[in-house]
Curated annotation (Swiss-Prot):
The gene is mpl3. This is MAP kinase phosphatase with leucine-rich repeats protein 3. The keyword Lipoprotein applies. Residues 11-24 have a biased composition (Gly residues). GO terms for molecular function: phosphoprotein phosphatase activity; protein serine/threonine phosphatase activity; protein tyrosine phosphatase activity. It comes from Dictyostelium discoideum. Residues 632-773 form the Tyrosine-protein phosphatase domain.
Length: 856
């Protein structure tokens, strides 16, 4: 669980502790990293391969923690590749501290320091240093002895002096080597003991003092005995020096002084060696004996200021202690209370591990952290843990576990629980006391084995979202509409055959009951959108709406040449306008009476209910005001249907609607029922603006027309939005003589979700211009043919000079006028045809007048 520290990122700047090496210089995962998610603190233990949670995993946060912004992390797990801009400053500070420590170690002979540092060469992988507190008497004796040795060494030149100098150089070289090793060596690995982490802490933090607890009396006695032996040795050496100086003559003082210096150095070196072997191995002896309990005293204010200025590491007041039995850090009640007032954790993620249970110790720590969101998904829980100990929980996620029962007793004791997610388990039933979770708002138990729902589920009056999809439900509770606050319901992929009353669900926004076995659909959903109907129709200009209706009604009307026929058409249009206004007002009044005006339904998904063949009439009134996702295709005009792929794979619905032809506008799809229906496929059809779909217009229009005459035709693509709608619009422009805007409005009124892509729209506009030009050319050609016929008739009338000549010419002119009127009536579909027909009629009348004059 520890971290591997590298020297490049300031690896020796942190101190190990707890279950993993902490510190600010690292590039991997930190055990004490807290992610700041917009003011909400998050701990991520996701995908760590944990089989059991231990208290020391969380006790590291009692010692120190580091708050990291989410934008400084690269991946979404919040645990890798943290930015380490601050590590350079820390590494430089640590290097300066190490240099100052080395200088202090070299100058201990001249400085009157209380703390003495010594080094040893041990067999461990990391060098060790200790901080000892010496009594004042021993310090004075050491100072006097060291001063004597310095003077004697400077005055002497014997082989003993050279040995002493060599010994000092060796010790200095050892210090240099060890200090350089400290600079380049990483922090102890996670496999090393907790004692080594404290040793590295002593190496890097020289201001710390070490005290021993009263429990370790044996160690105290040993240290006292060592100090007494050192004091006795120093006293004996001083007495020998005084006696030798008094006994010898003045003539031999120099020689005696030299000899005394050598003899005086020996006990000093011996004392130094004893001090190395007795005082320092307090940590080395711990390899064979039990380690001593130690407590590190830290200045809270200074450390917090330094941490906030340099690295975002925050150190609480009380740090962890080392356990002498197992060598692991533990926490006490005081540290927990201090952490509780220091920081609060909003969410904890323990997903994608191998957890089977959570002990009460861990749950009590979670309670002290006041965790609100707990994620335990993708583990091996067979029984829900005792989460009632964490009273602050608001969200619990137990997705992808091995739960077979829903133990509501655990969640009833959580007063703040609002969201419960139990997806992808093996739960077969919901207990009757589910309504005791009073504040539950979001409940998701999808992809389980539920077969029925208790009636008490309807008592969850605060429930907003309910997801029970992908189960084995066949019915819903009869009082299901008592859940008056429901806004989103997902019941897809079940076996539901009928629905209860839904009239009270006035706050419902989304209802998904796709992929079931519905036999009928209640009309209650149509009455859950009356408020939107009122609002939408109150903003509609009825006269403007009537103009659009008139354009559709006048599609198949013929333009008569006489003024009487025009007046009759205007009268008929006025009657149609009055009827349309009355229909709109009747629809608004009917919805006001039946609906109540409180619904807000936006989407109803009834797709893939193969037994559901028809919809109630009420849904026709609101199909443009809500998104109705269904497998039933939309009927644009009688005999022409528009839909998606789900409409084409339901043979019973197609046969019920009388469809015989299917136009398939998908490049990578084969016909579903080639033996039952007649297909026309566009193999390379792509929903892309650069694709030229206009090259198929002439052929598809002929196929649609033949299918409409034979019974019905379905035009579909994958979603029934772009490709299929483009083909239907082109057909309406060609055979129903509509403009692009008229055809687009008509199709969109029948199927609101259609939307041809911009490239297809441009192609339809070009096709409109092409059709307009061809119509004009056809009209002009008809007029020229009529003129030729009139001139030939005039020549015949001139040659006939009989008494009834006038009557014959009048009859011929009347016949020609009748022929022109019938031809023009067949071609009068565009806005320009009335003018052209009038011109042709005028020309024919003038020709007849000329005939009359000529005959006279």
């Amino acid at each position: 669980m520890g971290n591997s520290h590298s020297s490049e990122n300031g690896g020796n700047s942190g101190s190990g502790g707890g279950s993993g090496g902490g510190g600010s210089g690292y590039s991997g995962v930190s055990e004490n990293m807290i992610i700041d998610l917009e003011g909400r603190y998050h701990i991520d233990y996701k995908n760590r391969n944990y089989k059991k949670l231990k208290p020391q995993m969380f006790s590291t946060f009692f010692e120190h923690y580091e708050i990291v912004q989410a934008d400084s992390l690269i991946n979404s797990d919040f645990i890798k590749n943290k930015t380490v801009k601050k590590n350079r400053d820390n590494s430089s500070n640590n290097n300066s501290n190490n240099n100052s420590n080395n200088n202090n170690n070299n100058n201990t002979l001249n400085n009157s320091t209380i703390i003495t540092t010594t080094t040893t060469t041990t067999t461990t992988s990391t060098p060790t240093t200790t901080i000892m507190i010496t009594p004042p008497q021993q310090q004075q004796q050491q100072r006097t002895s060291l001063d004597l040795t310095n003077r004697d060494i400077s005055e002497s030149s014997t082989p003993n002096e050279q040995q002493i100098r060599l010994a000092q150089e060796e010790t200095e070289n050892q210090e240099i080597v060890e200090s350089s090793f400290l600079k380049s060596s990483p922090v102890p690995s996670p496999s090393s003991s907790v004692l080594k982490s404290f040793e590295s802490d002593f190496q890097l933090n020289t201001d710390l003092t070490t005290e021993t607890f009263d429990d370790n009396s044996a160690e105290k006695k040993r240290q006292q005995q060592q100090q007494q032996q050192q004091n006795e040795d120093s006293k004996q050496s001083s007495q020998q020096q005084t006696q030798k100086s008094k006994d010898k003559d003045e003539s031999a003082k120099i020689v005696n002084n030299k000899s005394s210096s050598t003899t005086n150095i020996k006990p000093i070196l011996a004392a130094a060696q004893t001090s190395r072997s007795t005082s320092i191995p307090a940590f080395n002896r711990n390899k064979t004996k039990e380690p001593t309990k130690q407590k590190i005293k830290k200045e809270h204010s200074t450390l917090r200021k330094n941490s906030l200025s340099s690295s975002n590491i925050i150190t609480p007041n009380n740090t962890t202690n080392t356990n002498a039995k197992d060598g692991a850090s533990y926490f006490n009640e005081n540290s927990l209370m201090s952490v509780k007032s220091d920081i609060k954790i909003f969410s904890l993620d323990l997903s994608i591990n191998r957890l089977e249970n959570i002990t009460n110790d861990i749950l009590s720590i979670m309670a002290r952290f006041e965790i609100q969101e707990l994620t335990l998904s993708t583990n091996f829980f067979q029984i829900i843990p005792d989460l009632q100990l964490v009273k602050s929980l608001t969200t619990v996620n137990l997705t992808r576990n091995k739960l077979s029962k829903l133990q509501t007793s655990v969640f009833i004791e959580l007063p703040s629980l609002t969201s419960l997610i139990l997806d992808r388990n093996f739960i077969s039933s919901i207990p009757d006391d589910i309504d005791q979770i009073k504040n539950l708002k979001y409940l998701s138990i999808k992809h389980n084995a539920l077969e029925y729902l208790p009636n008490s589920l309807s008592n969850l009056s605060q429930l907003i979202s309910l997801d029970l999809s992908q189960n084995k439900l066949k019915t819903l509770p009869p009082n299901f509409d008592d859940l008056i606050n429901l806004r989103m319901v997902w019941l897809s992929y079940n076996q539901i055959t009928s629905l209860p009353s839904m009239r009270k669900l006035v706050n419902l926004v989304t209802f998904d009951i796709s992929s079931n076995k519905l036999l009928s659909l209640p009309k209650d959903f149509a009455y859950l959108v009356p408020s939107r109907i009122k609002q939408s129709y109150s903003d509609i200009d009825i006269d403007e709406y009537d103009e659009n209706i008139n354009t559709c009604n006048n599609i198949n009307s013929n333009n008569n040449d006489s003024n009487n026929s025009n007046n009759n058409n205007n009268n008929n249009n006025d009657n149609n306008n009055n009827c349309n206004k009355n229909n709109i007002l009747e629809m608004i009044n009917s919805t006001e009476l039946e609906g109540g005006g409180l619904g807000c339904l936006k989407e109803l998904n009834i797709r893939d209910n193969r037994e559901l063949i028809s919809l109630p009439v009420e849904y026709k009134q609101v199909e443009s005001l809500m998104t109705l996702v269904t497998s039933i295709p939309s009927e644009i005009i009688p005999g022409i249907f528009l839909g998606g792929l789900d409409s084409a794979n339901n043979a019973p619905i197609l046969q019920t609607l009388g469809i015989t032809h299917i136009l398939l506008a998908i490049g990578d799809c084969e016909p579903f029922f080639p033996k039952t229906f007649k297909y026309y496929s566009i193999d390379d059809a792509r929903d892309a603006p650069q694709y030229d779909i206009s090259q198929h217009f002439e052929q598809t229009n002929c196929f649609i027309e033949s299918g409409r005459k034979s019974g019905g035709v379905l035009v579909h693509c994958r979603a029934g939005i772009s490709r299929s709608s483009t083909l239907v619009i082109s057909y309406l422009m060609k055979y129903q003589r509509m403009t692009f805007k008229q055809a687009m409005d008509l199709v969109q009124s029948k199927r609101p979700q259609i939307q041809p892509n911009p490239g297809f729209k441009d192609q339809l506009l070009k096709y409109e211009a092409k059709l307009f030009c061809t119509n004009i050319l056809n009209i002009s050609s008809h007029n020229s043919n009529n003129k030729n016929n009139n001139s030939s008739n005039n020549r015949k009338s001139i040659n006939n000079r009989k008494s009834n000549n006038i009557i014959i010419t009048i009859n011929n002119s009347s016949n020609s006028n009748n022929n022109n009127s019938t031809d023009n009536s067949n071609n009068s579909s565009t806005s320009t045809t009335p003018n052209l027909s009038s011109l042709s009629s005028d020309s024919s009348s003038s020709a007849s007048l000329s005939k009359l004059s000529i005959s006279k």
